[in-house]
């Protein structure tokens, strides 16, 4: 099992942070364009799920998968979106995404007066702690294959 990449978006679609670990194929477009496409897809899926679901969707959509990867999604009440792409063998990771938001982003970025909100995260401490946390996950594989 493995982690491919992670996106962190604000409520307006600004990509606050992007990391990758075992991404085998690049999108072939500039990163800014990739971020816009990802956010647009998330917006569309979220809207579709909320309108088409036969049941009340308390948590909205949590994940979707293709034949090659699984996208995990977590949205906070303030509209911050945490997205992690993994391989298909990874089960639900809502608690992992919540931890990334609450213990890393909120503690190291939001509560840091030197980190302006609504802009790309420049904190090296956030980046290194995020990297360490993701690498410590039981489904993170040093040998993605």
Curated annotation (Swiss-Prot):
SUPFAM superfamilies: SNARE-like
Keywords from the named record: Endoplasmic reticulum, ER-Golgi transport, Golgi apparatus, Transport
Cellular component annotations (GO), alphabetically ordered: azurophil granule lumen; cytoplasm; cytosol; endoplasmic reticulum; extracellular region; TRAPP complex; TRAPPII protein complex; TRAPPIII protein complex
Role this protein plays: May play a role in vesicular transport from endoplasmic reticulum to Golgi.
Localization per record: Golgi apparatus, cis-Golgi network; Endoplasmic reticulum
Subunit and partners: Part of the multisubunit transport protein particle (TRAPP) complex. The heterodimer TRAPPC6B-TRAPPC3 interacts with TRAPPC1 likely providing a core for TRAPP complex formation.
Organism for this UniProt entry: Homo sapiens
Stated family: Belongs to the TRAPP small subunits family. BET5 subfamily.
Pfam families from the UniProt entry: Sybindin
BP terms from Gene Ontology: COPII vesicle coating; endoplasmic reticulum to Golgi vesicle-mediated transport; vesicle coating; vesicle tethering
Signal sequence region: none
Entry protein name: Trafficking protein particle complex subunit 1
